Amino acid sequence: MIKLEQVVEILKKDNNFREISSAGEYYFNWPKEVNFDQLSYDSRKSTKDTLFFAKGLNFKKEYLTDLEAAFYVSEFDYEVALPAIIVTDVKRAMALIAANFYKFPQNKLKTLALTGTKGKTTSAYFAKSILDKMNGGKTALLSTAQTTLDGQNYFKSELTTPESLDLLEMMAKALENGMTHLVMEVSSQAYKTERVYGLTFDVGVFLNISPDHIGPVEHPTLEDYFYCKRQLLKNSRYFVANAEMNHFAIIKEELNERKIPHAFYGADSENKIIESKGLHFVTDGSVSGEFDIRLLGRFNQENALATALATKALGASFENIRQGLASAIVPGRMELLTAKNGAHIYIDYAHNGLSLENLVEVVEDHHAGQLFLVLGSTGNKGESRRKDFGQVIENHPRLNVILTTDDSNRENPKTIADEIASFVSRELDFELDREFAIKKAISKTQNSDDAVIIAGKGADMFQLKDGKREPYIGDSPAAQKYL
């Protein structure tokens, strides 16, 4: 429960309160006592004791006409019968009010937040596995792929970083379930849309940056994308950053100026990988020793080093780190299947140019035969990825490519595929039925020298079409049918 008086006080302290509007009158303080038993931004879940948040570009006045709620919070006075708390920024208001409503669960959990263009989910699972070794399995996880609030039962995530109201509720539930630590991915959109406003993380990690999510729906420019991601820096008590990432200089400069304790990793830093072979690697620095992970590729080893440094800052021992990394399983990340003829099938969530480039390089290094790539791209978001995908394909002439459907949403998947193909000088194959595209690629393999890469969906069991998630067999189950 939270009182209206408390809500107004929170907003005033944040310089985010304009007035209360009711029946044509305006109030700086409401004359009566009002208690809210629930917070919601979903009209279907609102009750007479709900404080409702009217947010979103597509919000309409009619949504409030028959709404059952006590008050609504908005940047705009819709002049309906329901009393309104008018604010400057409804998203910031929701974040701070939710934190108070759920009794500040973020202060009772040890939190580790990860950002970067690629590798967030893999690193999140690495970190959870390490912390579980330290705390006996009391680590909650919020990732792009899955969410667990009790450390054991997982459900599909809706967003990389949930809306602030949902996020604070999840944190509170994690505490109720006896969790002591939380690992979460923080997207650039989370900062752009104030989903993590008011939160300070115990440890923040910045893995890398490359052009992605650039488009009219997400970030207009790379600068905006990078700036939003950098907000994690000043909202972390300790910070881990990749010294080899693009534009590292400004990160180093800002960390030093803000006097935030930190650790860097990479070839030219104190913490580095000095030996790498297959699934085994050796590190030097503050976490020095030999490690094994279940994923191929140096970039995965670099992510492992980043999480080793981050979890060490939370108290993990060398053995916690070594055992945690060795046992970590990441769904939809370089999942490996073997066909009857010995060919390897790699299923990976790689959904931007940088992650696809790294994935292709690893597979090329391990397979001398034919290489097949099954790939699509999302519709109505991340439009810049299509050019990036085309350039990766162009730069790797060994790839036999079958362009297919990803989460096409409200765009024509053939139009998306054609755009990818426009950046490639050689002929590509098209099969818009994703399962048949997978079948076709596997059927073309001959022996253990060959490999198929199925990229973009990972462990997703749906395809986004016309704004709705439609059931999809999943890349792994589809591939298993045709091995």
From Swiss-Prot:
Sequence positions that bind UDP-N-acetyl-alpha-D-muramoyl-L-alanyl-D-glutamate: 43, 160-161, 187, 195
Coiled coil: none
SUPFAM superfamilies recorded: MurD-like peptide ligases, catalytic domain, MurD-like peptide ligases, peptide-binding domain, MurE/MurF N-terminal domain
Keyword Cell membrane attached: no
Subcellular location as annotated: Cytoplasm
A GO molecular function held by the record: acid-amino acid ligase activity
Pathway where this protein functions: Cell wall biogenesis; peptidoglycan biosynthesis
Enzyme Commission code: 6.3.2.-
Disulfide cysteine pairs (residue numbers): none
Post-translation changes: Carboxylation is probably crucial for Mg(2+) binding and, consequently, for the gamma-phosphate positioning of ATP.
GO cellular component assignments: cytoplasm
GO biological process: cell division; cell wall organization; peptidoglycan biosynthetic process; regulation of cell shape
InterPro entries in the cross-refs: Mur-like_cat_sf, Mur_ligase_C, Mur_ligase_C_dom_sf, Mur_ligase_cen, MurE/MurF_N, UDP-N-AcMur-Glu-dNH2Pim_ligase
Tagged with keyword Nucleotide-binding: yes
Protein family: Belongs to the MurCDEF family. MurE subfamily.
Entries under PANTHER family matching the protein: MUR LIGASE FAMILY MEMBER, UDP-N-ACETYLMURAMOYL-L-ALANYL-D-GLUTAMATE--2,6-DIAMINOPIMELATE LIGASE MURE HOMOLOG, CHLOROPLASTIC
Function: Catalyzes the addition of an amino acid to the nucleotide precursor UDP-N-acetylmuramoyl-L-alanyl-D-glutamate (UMAG) in the biosynthesis of bacterial cell-wall peptidoglycan.
Name of the protein in its database record: UDP-N-acetylmuramyl-tripeptide synthetase
Gene that produces this protein: murE
